């Protein structure tokens, strides 16, 4: 595999192999595309711990914030604000997503993957190794985040980058069998997409 450079990323956006909806020109870097934090986050209820320092936010979460249940799991659903931050504290497990719909189309032989920005990591944000995409996957990317120290989160924060590798052979289209995308039409995907789509789905590849 080899990473696409800036010129190759641009070329593949132009020819339709790379989907980069919502991406501004300045987000396209030498070997990747920068992505920003989406409007909503989901916090696993059992990962919320009492904190004297963030006592008011703790009370707000417990008594005011919207709760949802999905497949037997409880979440707080929080709308992020660009001006007023939400404090993610150590121990929290948060599902977030990118503002951008981004990835590759089936038949392109291009594999998209996500990496945390180094600045995000230095702020104390942690992201596990669940950033590998597949050929044909494009969507708003789910971000599974934990935190080493208290971190301010705002809608639109620069959080990570998507890079692209070439794949040898003829891989199948992710939309044909993937757990988190079954639509290969961008317009339809955007029209039907909702934040709850990032919550854990039915795993299809269990033996």
Put a short name on every predicted segment.
Residues 1-207:
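DUTPase catalytic domain/fold
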């Amino acid at each position: 595999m080899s990473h696409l450079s800036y010129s190759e990323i641009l070329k593949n956006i132009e020819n339709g192999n790379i989907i980069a909806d919502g991406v501004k020109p300045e987000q396209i870097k030498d070997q990747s595309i920068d992505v920003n934090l989406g409007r909503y986050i989901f916090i696993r209820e059992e990962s919320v711990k009492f904190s004297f320092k963030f006592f008011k936010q703790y009370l707000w979460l417990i008594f005011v914030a919207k709760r949802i249940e999905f497949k037997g799991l409880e979440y707080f659903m929080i709308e992020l604000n660009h001006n007023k931050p939400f404090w993610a504290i150590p121990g929290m497990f948060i599902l977030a997503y990118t503002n951008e719909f981004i990835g590759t189309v089936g038949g392109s032989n291009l594999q998209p993957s996500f990496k945390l920005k180094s600045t995000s990591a230095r702020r104390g944000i942690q992201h596990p190794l669940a950033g590998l995409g597949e050929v044909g996957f494009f969507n708003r990317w789910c971000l599974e985040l934990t935190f080493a120290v208290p971190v301010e989160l705002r809608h639109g924060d620069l959080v990570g980058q998507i890079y692209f590798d070439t794949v040898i052979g003829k891989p199948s289209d992710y939309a044909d069998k993937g757990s988190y995308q079954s639509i290969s039409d961008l317009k339809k995907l955007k029209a039907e997409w909702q934040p709850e789509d990032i919550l854990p789905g039915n795993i299809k590849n269990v033996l």
